[in-house]
Amino acid sequence: MAGHSQFKNIMHRKGRVDAVRSKVFGKLAREITVAAKLGTPDPAMNPRLRAAILAARAENMPKDNIERAIKKAAGADGENYEDIRYEGYGPGGAALIVEAQTDNRNRTASDVRSAFTKSGGSLAETGAVAFMFDRVGVIAYPASVADADTMLEAAIEAGADDVSSGEDGHEVICAQDSYGEVTKALEARFGEPARTGLIWKAQNTINVDDETGEKLIRLVEVIEDQDDVQHVYVNFALSDALVAKLQA
């Protein structure tokens, strides 16, 4: 078990989610507001906003919170956030990409650098690790919509590059350029996805021992706890034994 799905499942284990739910809601609301402000407040015409709303629903964010975040984008006195990316290294030479939204670059850079340093990592220059990742689209469906063969056939026909299917559902990966077309084709067949968006996917993953793995997970948790941080992407894989321990 390795890669993006493994990491996502670990970071969303129950205890972790319960402990940071209010902070998660705040970050989701910010992304919804930013997406609505950059485009149209109509999710049918704004793919980024639609993806943000799906992410909020997946976390059981109340409908009122979602609608309030969209309306906030129309306010003249609302904060102006910009997207920014940081790159760095963790224990064992693992690579990390951090996506943040900030209204103060200096504050966010200082917070992210401190998070790296406190947990045995180091912040690097932009471009230092991005070449190890691909910017791709991901469209996720629950396992109940189709069996693995049916989803694979539909995804390839739609122009996707890869499909991962299991008990947790189906995760379709496609090139960034074909993200819109693939999403539309899959929706026509299976309905609205559970989750969709653009991510940084590691081209290759490195295996780390359990001691290093625990340090890396701690590093990611510290980074994710920063208010301005939206997503963290990694290129390491953990042993099945450590995964089971972390999910217990």
Swiss-Prot record:
* Pfam families on file: TACO1_YebC_N, Transcrip_reg
The main place the protein resides is: cytoplasm
* Recorded GO CC terms: cytosol
InterPro entries in alphabetical order: Integrase-like_N, TACO1_YebC-like_2nd/3rd_dom, TACO1_YebC_N, Transcrip_reg_TACO1-like, Transcrip_reg_TACO1-like_dom3, YebC-like
The record's subcellular location field reads:
Cytoplasm
Q: Name one GO molecular function term.
A: DNA binding
Alphabetical UniProt keywords: Cytoplasm, DNA-binding, Transcription, Transcription regulation
Name by which UniProt lists this protein: Probable transcriptional regulatory protein Mrad2831_3553
List the source organism: Methylobacterium radiotolerans (strain ATCC 27329 / DSM 1819 / JCM 2831 / NBRC 15690 / NCIMB 10815 / 0-1)
